[in-house]
Amino acid sequence: MKTIVLFHRLELNTLFVPVGRALDSAGGVRVVHLAYGSEELAQLRAAGITGPVTVFKDEIRRLYRPGPVDPGDLAELDAFFLKGSKGAFNLNAALQSDRGFPLLSLDEAQGLTLAYHRFWGEFQQRYGADAVLHEPCTLMFNFVAAMHCAARGGDYFYPIMAQGPGKGFNHLLMSGFDFTCPDLDRRL
């Protein structure tokens, strides 16, 4: 049985709640709901999701340690990113690519990255996710999730809106950290 994580943040609840229900109904897939924060958790509960839901922000608060990160941990992160991205990103490149990290000190950005790495490692051990659905890898916590999926031979997916036929919009399913689109690949 495949395990799919639906990582709910902001408006993704609107999309992922019915997706989760459809996957549950189809059978053969275990759906795990991950809420970004307490607001998303409340929305999931209001939508009738009653099972256990991990709250990402609570877990990061538990795992984050202020102050300089141990150089050994930084070397581990660097090697993990290089391997998972097939050489496209090292730790420094990933830190510089996060659109939110310019607001933080280097110690804070490295500490958060280590907390994200520990979270996704624990989460993957607990649930053995074959796929994570969330949003593009423009923030470190998404990039780290994609790297953990790659390490397990799994997939990191995210939907984007694209102009469809006529005046409508469709969702395209993208994968990985490099903006690969299986939908387009199949059609080409």
Regions found by a protein language model. Give the residues of each.
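Beta-sheet entry/capping signal
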Residues: 2-4, 30-32, 130-131, 153-157
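Conserved N-terminal ligand/cofactor-binding loop architecture of enzyme catalytic domains
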Residues: 22, 26-120, 161-188
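Glycine-rich, histidine-containing beta strand-loop boundary motifs that form or position
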Residues: 35, 135-136, 143, 158-162
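Glycosyltransferases and closely related glycan-assembly transferases
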Residues: 124-128, 144-156
